[in-house]
Amino acid sequence: MADWTRAQSSGAVEDILDRENKRMADSLASKVTRLKSLALDIDRDTEDQNRYLDGMDSDFTSVTGLLTGSVKRFSTMARSGRDNRKLLCGMAVVLIVAFFILSYLLSRTRT
């Protein structure tokens, strides 16, 4: 801080006040620069996350379309008659076994 007791004239006081004012202005300018940089980083990160979420939305939309078509075909096959019920049960068993095999293999690769 300024040393007011050593100031001998009004010119010295003005010089001290001017130096302190410049120091505080420089400090404020550096803080503003840091805040601006932080705001720009947040903006960039937000835009990246929005792009990522838009991509996920389109992925989920396409997966929903695929699953809807599969469910319709599966339902049509189930309603088509008794002969297909054996096939339907066989497919269900194969899918369940495949699920357990894949989960086992994935658990082994992670450990």
Curated annotation (Swiss-Prot):
InterPro entries to which the protein is assigned, alphabetical: BET1_SNARE (IPR039899), T_SNARE_dom (IPR000727)
Keyword tags: Coiled coil, Golgi apparatus, Membrane, Phosphoprotein, Protein transport, Transmembrane, Transmembrane helix, Transport
GO CC, any one term: cytosol
Domain of life: Eukaryota
Subcellular location as annotated: Golgi apparatus membrane; Golgi apparatus, trans-Golgi network membrane
Phosphoserine sites (modified residues): S9, S37
UniProt GO molecular function: SNAP receptor activity
Ranges for domain t-SNARE coiled-coil homology: 15-77
Gene3D superfamilies documented for this protein: 1.20.5.110
Subunit structure: Component of a SNARE complex consisting of STX5, YKT6, GOSR1 and BET1L. Interacts with STX5.
Protein name as annotated: BET1-like protein
Organism whose genome encodes this protein: Mus musculus (Mouse)
